[in-house]
Design a protein with these regions (language model features):
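N- or domain-start disorder-to-order transition segments that initiate the globular core
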Residues: 1-6
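A short, well-ordered alpha-helical element
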Residues: 7-16
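Surface-exposed alpha-helical segments enriched in charged/polar residues
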Residues: 12, 43-47, 88, 144
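Internal, conserved structured core segments that host functional sites
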Residues: 66-156
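N-terminal active-site beta-alpha-beta segment that forms phosphate/nucleotide-binding
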Residues: 15-71
Length: 156
């Protein structure tokens, strides 16, 4: 079973910055047993990435809803995502780390939303106007901003 210390050490050894934007895509099944399961992994990653002002971004796509024209693609009252367990947990997971609360801030892109954890003002600014993006990777959208702001993609 992986502990917080194991994962923090591995991230540090890989050179994952703690003051940048990190887009994390995960397969919880591929990761294996983690202390605290899915919510434990979220807490571990939030603590590591936000320690020096970074933002942790987790895709929470809902594009699968396009198959049912009677359903909205993004329902802000639902925790539905079509890309796995960790993204679904992230939609509603609030982390409490060292006495500080980290709430998820979900972008409003109709098919390619993401949850962002970190400084509340920075997170809200990062996802602002996402619903106006003309594509899932528009330059002004969350995915388009990632390279422009020196962000990283972490496949876990």
């Amino acid at each position: 079973m992986y502990t917080k210390q194991d994962i923090h050490r591995q991230l540090s050894e890989m050179g994952v910055p703690r003051d940048s934007i990190i887009l994390m895509h995960t397969s919880l099944r591929a990761v294996g047993e983690v202390e605290g399961r899915g919510c434990g992994l979220l807490d571990i990653m939030i603590e590591y990435v936000t320690a020096e002002g970074g933002l942790l971004c987790i895709p929470t796509h809902t594009w699968k809803n396009l198959e049912d024209l009677g359903k909205p693609t993004l329902d802000r009252n639902s925790d539905y995502t079509c890309i796995g367990t960790l993204p679904t947990l992230a939609v509603r997971h609030t982390a409490y780390i060292n006495g500080k609360e980290y709430k998820p801030h979900r972008s409003r892109h109709p098919t390619h939303s993401m949850v962002v954890y970190g400084d509340e003002e920075k997170a809200k600014k990062y996802i602002a106007s996402e619903e106006l993006s003309e594509s899932s990777t528009a330059p002004g959208g969350c995915y388009g901003k990632l390279p422009a702001m020196g962000g990283y993609i972490l496949l876990v």
